[in-house]
Swiss-Prot record:
Alphabetized InterPro entries for the sequence: DUF1439
Membrane topology per record: Lipid-anchor
Cellular component aspect of the GO annotation: plasma membrane
Keyword Signal: yes
Lipidation (N-palmitoyl cysteine): 19
Primary localization: membrane
Record-given protein name: Uncharacterized lipoprotein YceB
Record's subcellular location: Cell membrane
Signal peptide: 1-18
Name of one Pfam family that matches: DUF1439
Keywords in alphabetical order: Cell membrane, Lipoprotein, Membrane, Palmitate, Signal
Length: 186
């Protein structure tokens, strides 16, 4: 009798796991990070020419999905800056922490990071902190514009069977700690 109940429970759990794959597709932090690696070396000129401007190159982007704040993605990364200001030319490095709202675009089959904003930035050398505070609004706008146009992740029809189904049947996204779930049903 116990063997029968165990076998029945095993079959039911196997069916539930199998059915779960038919009702949703999950994208992990690791997959998002691999996709974000394509955004490494994002470069942009920002600031007020002649007053304070910088050429910025973004590297080492990594994500944390839904861990710090529900329904948000937190990105960390480095930025190399070549800055020109009234004080002359300087080089600096920054550690950035960004937050964004993941949004699914069904037409493109892509996840975009909207409402991108710098929530923390530390600069080395520290004496550049004041100049960086001047440039921060420009950096925020440049990153927001870039990530509004460039998807963080694109579903591929030639990918796995689940990914192809997600591209065709997606009904939006759900942000869970460590993953983004794309349900196929409402």
């Amino acid at each position: 009798m116990n063997k029968f109940l165990f076998a029945a429970a095993l079959i039911v759990s196997g069916l539930l796991v199998g059915c779960n794959q038919l009702t949703q597709y999950t994208i992990t932090e690791q997959e998002i990070n691999q996709s974000l690696a394509k955004h490494n070396n994002f470069s942009k000129d920002i600031g007020l020419p002649g007053v304070a401007d910088a050429h910025i190159v973004l590297t080492n982007l990594t994500s944390q999905i839904g861990r710090e704040e529900p329904n948000k993605v937190t990105l960390t990364g480095d930025a190399n800056l070549d800055m020109n200001s009234l004080f002359g030319s300087q080089k600096a490095t920054m550690k950035l922490k960004l937050k964004a709202l993941p949004v699914f675009d069904k037409e493109k089959g892509a996840i975009f990071l909207k409402e991108m904003e710098v929530v923390d930035a530390t600069v080395q050398p520290e004496k550049m902190q004041t100049v960086m505070q001047t440039l921060l609004p420009y950096l925020n706008q440049a990153l927001r514009n870039y990530f509004n146009q460039q998807p963080a992740y694109v579903l591929r029809e030639d990918g796995s069977q689940g990914e192809a189904m997600a591209k065709k049947l997606a009904k939006g996204i759900e942000v869970k700690p460590g993953e983004i779930v794309i349900p196929f049903t409402d």
